[in-house]
């Protein structure tokens, strides 16, 4: 699909200066394609429809046929299986390192794909990210999507070419947070 986003994991970061501007390049990263799966949700008692965007994860690497032809079937499809695992089962047990790593990858994958999609649509409409905070509000209601803050900073600095202060100003004016677990009705009551 045309709106597929690329989410990058790992790799190395290279910095270079050009005409007084710092540029950041992520090299040798593992790239996972985020494929949008849009579901139309009809409003109650109205003719309006909203779109709920979900994401599927796919590998950018094809099955390694040289490994496959040598009988190493699982190794040949390893990249594909790992990419698909990101979106297959959410929130695995995190009482071991593998579960913690997968949860973090899932959180970053969904945040990055969604923010890249929002930024692309915004840039298509307005031609700039400088007014992002005037047209968008991103509400995070839990700790899982908190990665939206550093990812928006990355997009504004690395992709849109802003300096830190401008990117931080736009980010703080674009992101809102409500921690429901601190609200009174979610707290246990003391016993008499």
Q: Across the structure, where does each feature detected by a protein language model lie?
A:
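Beta-sheet entry/capping signal
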Residues: 51-53, 135-138, 164-169, 173
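Secondary-structure transition/capping motifs at alpha-helix termini
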Residues: 121-133, 156-169, 177, 181
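Function-dense linear segments that define catalytic or interfacial modules
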Residues: 46-137, 147
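Alpha-helical support elements that line or immediately flank enzyme active sites
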Residues: 112-116, 151-159
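Extended, Lys/Arg-enriched charged tracts that mediate electrostatic binding to polyanionic substrates
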Residues: 2-49
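Core structural elements
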Residues: 139-151, 174-178
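Conserved internal helical-beta-strand scaffold that buttresses enzyme catalytic cores
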Residues: 1-9, 14-17, 45, 60, ...
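Conserved small/polar residues in nucleotide/adenosyl-binding loops
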Residues: 185-192
């Amino acid at each position: 699909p045309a709106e597929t986003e690329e989410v990058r994991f790992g790799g190395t970061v290279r910095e270079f200066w050009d005409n007084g501007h710092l540029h950041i390049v992520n090299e040798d990263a593992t790239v996972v394609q985020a494929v949008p799966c849009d579901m139309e949700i009809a409003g109650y008692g109205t003719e309006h429809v909203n779109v709920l965007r979900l994401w599927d994860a796919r590998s950018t690497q094809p099955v390694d046929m040289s490994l496959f032809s040598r009988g190493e079937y699982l190794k040949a499809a390893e990249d594909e299986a790992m990419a698909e695992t990101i979106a297959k089962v959410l929130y695995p047990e995190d009482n071991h390192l593998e579960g913690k790593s997968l949860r973090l990858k899932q959180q970053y994958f969904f945040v990055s794909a969604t923010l890249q999609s929002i930024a692309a649509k915004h840039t298509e409409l307005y031609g700039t990210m400088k007014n992002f905070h005037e047209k968008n509000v991103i509400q995070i209601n839990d700790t899982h999507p908190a990665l939206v803050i550093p990812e928006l900073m990355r997009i504004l600095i690395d992709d849109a070419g802003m300096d830190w202060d401008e990117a931080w100003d736009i980010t703080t004016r674009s992101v809102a947070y409500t921690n429901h677990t601190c609200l009174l009705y979610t707290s246990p009551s003391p016993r008499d």
